[in-house]
Amino acid sequence: MPYAVLAAALVALDQLVKYLVSHNIPLGGHVPLLPHLVELTYFQNTVAAFSMLEEHTWLLTLISAVMSVVLGVAVWKKFFAHPFGRCALTLVLAGAVGNLIDRALQGYVVDMFNVLFMDFAIFNVADICVVVGGIAACVYYVFFYEKLEGKGTLHEHADADR
């Protein structure tokens, strides 16, 4: 239950920020957020990361929907037993759902955070959730999964089968 609340809160935050930006900043407009560091730039993104799948919004929507279901089941079925692992998956789920809502309803994703001190893509709250959750899930799996969940490694299982 707390993971559903966390996911819902993050999706709500993502949608609120997107609403505020799209209703208060003209398309392509800029508003300083942290002067000389980050500005809000209203951008309508029709592609995936690194301009992949341009002109295939339906495919991005389908992929987002499938991933949302898979991640939801993984959290619900406790793919990671430890709360840290489930929180990581919940972050990725919230990000997937946040961007899925935009793609399904508008055909594009509203992006707004523009980092000024380096050449980087404009992104949104959902993207932050996906990246932070994905990194956390990888760190958890690589460094803590076996220790915290008490499961043997793939190599141990393979050796036992011989």
Give each language-model segment a name.
Residues 1-162:
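Alpha-helical transmembrane bundles and membrane-interface segments of multipass inner-membrane proteins
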